[in-house]
Amino acid sequence: MCRSLRYCVSHCLYTAMTRLEEANREVNMYSSVRYLGYLAQLSLLVAICMGLYVRWDQTDDSFILVIFILGLVIFAIASILYYYFSMEAASLSLCNLWFGFLLGLLCFIDSSTFQHDLKEEATKYLLVSSIIIKTLSALVERICGCVRHRPTLLTSSEFLELVGFAIASTIMLMQKSLSIILLVAALAMIIIDLRMKSFLSIAILVVFASLTPELFFRSLDIPVNPYALSCFFFCIISNPFLDVYFSGLSVTERWKPYLYRGRFCRRFSVISIGLIELVFFVFAALKLGDLHLWYFVIPGFSIFGIFWLICHIIFLITLWGFNTKLNECHKVYSTHRPDNNSLDRVMASKGMRHFCLISERLVFFSLLATIILGAVSWQSSNGLFISIFLIVLPLESMAHGLFHELGNCLGGTSIGYAVVIPTNFCSPNGQPMLLPPEHVEELNLRSTGMLNSIQRFFASHMIETYGCDYSTSGLNFDTLHSKLKSFLDLRTSDGPRHDTYIIYYTGHSHSTGEWALAGGETLRFETLLEWWREKNGSFCSRLIIVLDTESSQPWVKEVRRVGDQYVAVQGAEMARVVDIEEADPPQLGDFTKEWVEYNCNPDNNINWTEKGRTVKAVYAVSKPWSDYTLHLPTGNDVTKHWMTYFPHITYPLVHLANWCGALNMFWLCKICYKCLKRLKMNWFLPAVLDTGQGFKLVKS
């Protein structure tokens, strides 16, 4: 046995030293962060080996010895696949599956008789250190920009670890094992809920973390190792939990695995949700067999059970109607795909925003009905009921989050105006001057490229174009004043103002950020902001200014002080000193080219945090930027929605949901949430900010 342990330790040390040699070949931040992750895995592996050894040593159970030896063989096979056959995916899959399985064994094998053993204490410390290192590694990876977020529900490693943990529960009786398998499914739903950034995902996570150790495992009456259970929970939840803040994916990007799924799969998911809801209702009805509190249970279940049924009929009709409208959007999307119309733009044109805003209120009532019915029919000794309840909560939370986020990001109209002044030289008084003839052709090509890029940007995101002014001699103040005021006064064909106004400028600027215009005139940020206040008034439109100039930082700093308008400035910062042997000196247009490519090509490989960039991105937003919301549906919209999708018998509940939604019952929570969002935007500005219009603001 000691030989096996020595072999395991020596193999792990060999792996670590091999990794260290690879890191020494190319020492950089990314390899250092990755090495921290390897340390967490090594600590966990040693903890598992020591924990299994202690259990075998104390119980003399040959099953543990067989599993331990088999685990070593599996890890040896994984190492061979990784190092000799370059089958990294297969190797990591085997490791993740066995990590989950062995952690489950540590969790479920009774250790109460030897919990004060010295080696068992060391195992506990190793498990705790693994939690700390894993969490720290995940945090550092995201702070350093080493993680490239991609649309997914569950990663392969998370899925395999969950499967391994569920398989480990089969060492118990069937009913207890089934309860734990359903609990693992609930944890998978919560991971997806967090990754989708659902509005109630954190609250659902807190409920899960509170109920599981205190009530669920107590209902099963089984001894559980809290250290192994905590290690499994924190290691698997740390990445999706941190991604709630660090993920820069837009709403449609996060929900891509569902929104872009085939029609049959989406319909099947709705039917599956309906079956899960029905199973929950059946288990809740088992409470009627408790005659001890019949005078409370029977009336309570009768009232809230009927309320739950009506709410969930509306819930399923809403999901079915959403998929019907989504199918229509996919038909249009497949027809107009060559025109670069994204799916979210098509959904906006099909009226999905109003549908989602109304549906959000109805789904919230369904979630509230589930919580009430769960409380009324609570069964503290039934692990199956608790696990199914914990599955239903994140499912309904995801539906609420989908409608909430789509309702907030879809439907915004936008209009853009671009000014391209291809002058690089200025007179001492600040007036732009024409370039020498030998540079004209080169500059014209570069300026035309900038013009084409910004036109591509407008077309790709279905931004209505007011105009793209290209002037080699510069624009005077009066001309620019007239054009900008006309642009800022534009409205949609239906009458209201556009939701977002985008101004793009590239050309010469002074060190203070002022635009250098013809005749020695300038345009200051305060002047443009005053024009915007004059035209926007009490409306809730946004202004986004994109600058490709040598001195955009002053405007980026000034916009942070704006407290009464929704304004954002995206600028560029050019390196002052560049090694010509390593990279070309930065020029105007380089930022535009990269920024447009980043926002128009989802398969781009642009890394804004890359070390040694000659052109860096900077942006800032005004103080109330995070408070921005689109217009809400009116009572007439709700009535039309009800008449279109729901039977007449459900109208009272639909009307009640609309009335309660208008009451703003959670105004205090929304105020706190608004304050937290403002704090985040003012003090912890994210590296990537989704504007909700299909493009993003970025900073290096």
Curated annotation (Swiss-Prot):
Membrane topology: Multi-pass membrane protein
Highest taxon above the source species: Eukaryota
UniProt subcellular location: Nucleus membrane
GO cellular component terms listed in the entry, alphabetical order: nuclear membrane
Transmembrane region(s): 36-56, 63-83, 89-109, 171-191, 197-217, 231-251, 268-288, 297-317, 355-375, 383-403
GO MF annotation, one: sodium channel regulator activity
Residues that carry a glycan: N340, N536, N607
Major localisation: nucleus
CDD domains the record matches: TMEM168
Database matches in InterPro entries: TMEM168
Keywords: Glycoprotein, Membrane, Nucleus, Transmembrane, Transmembrane helix
UniProt entry tagged with the keyword Nucleus: yes
PANTHER family cross-referenced by the UniProt entry: TRANSMEMBRANE PROTEIN 168 (PTHR14437:SF2)
Task of the protein: Plays a key role in maintaining the cardiac electrical stability by modulating cell surface expression of SCN5A.
Family: Belongs to the TMEM168 family.
Protein name in UniProt: Transmembrane protein 168
Provenance organism: Xenopus laevis (African clawed frog)
